[in-house]
Amino acid sequence: MVVSQNWIAIDERTWRYEDGGVRFFLLAGAERALLLDSGMTVHNARELARQLTDLPLSLFNTHCDIDHVGSNDEFDEVWVSPMELVHPKAPHDSRRVRPVWDGDVIDLGGRELEAIALPGHTPGSTALLDRASGMLFSGDPIQRDGRIFMFGPMRSLAAYIHSLRRLSLRKAEISSIWPCHATCPVDVDTIDELIAGAEAIERGEASFTVDEVHGNPVRACDGGPSILLCDPA
């Protein structure tokens, strides 16, 4: 079988797929494999994953923005935070939803992944921490050289700051961070740098420019490692 050149091996059990401006991940254990998000432009993520593993395959959504759910319809079951079900792109057939709460552990067989809730970017944004390796698959909330969407009715800067502060308390457990956008991987110090940047935005002290994203006026605020796209003042 020909393996797509978009697949990049991280180690012998972990891969990332570069899908334009977004990426998704494939994690394998001894018994099962897990796809973290399902792409933006691709609609055959299951088939792509089969290029690398024949283990039973499940899908986990870090959140349900449109650039993370491109192949969701390929899967009968989706692991996702119930807090994310308000999202218009979330699976609304309850039979397809396997709820994942903060602190839940997904065991792939000798490889445990802990769900860490990171609300703010979206209500149900959730990262997965590989407990053995310390690799944190962060979704969108943690980025370096990226543009983090914080505008619109479902997003909350205050919740985002709280999530990052909570995550910062666990930095000793994290060896590297693997975001779905921009630079990858990033170092653990990115968490505290984003906290400082977001707090400056909250205080009204961060510089910004006026921009437009998908027809929405936004403030493109200096958030330290990344730009935070916030609602107009």
Where are the language model's segments positioned?
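Structural motif
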Residues: 32-34, 58, 111, 134-135, ...
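A contiguous binding-surface segment within folded domains or other stable secondary-structure elements
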Residues: 113, 122-160
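Accessory terminal helices/loops
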Residues: 165-233
